[in-house]
């Protein structure tokens, strides 16, 4: 069984929480914003200007960097950089999270989501509504099992209705996965 950790771009792990136990279990996917704090193994960057900066800083040497194919071509196809296709025809919060969800689900059977704010919000901005909807669609269509970690509040309805998603606490998930790897 292949497992992947998926960190939301605004993830804040509890103080003192080392990511090494997570990394010992499975690779970590997330936005470029998570790489420095959490040493994300697989880094997604949708933004063309930021992708150019990351390439210049050598991110492709320290992680698996994923950028849009169109950006890759405009940057003269830099070595060691991975590409993905697709586009967004409407405004979406945290595009990197959506792309990372799709990519991680393409290689893992179980995706463990950390740091995601999936709380129901009345009168949410359309960009947030689109984010929740696209994330729910990615989870539903993947056919994989998803685990939301440390999310104490009620989930937004499109996420709550999914049959392939569960919730748990990070210490429980780490203990369960460590026990299964022995």
Where are the regions that the model predicts?
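Metal-ion/cofactor- or nucleotide/acyl-coenzyme-handling active-site neighborhoods
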Residues: 1-182
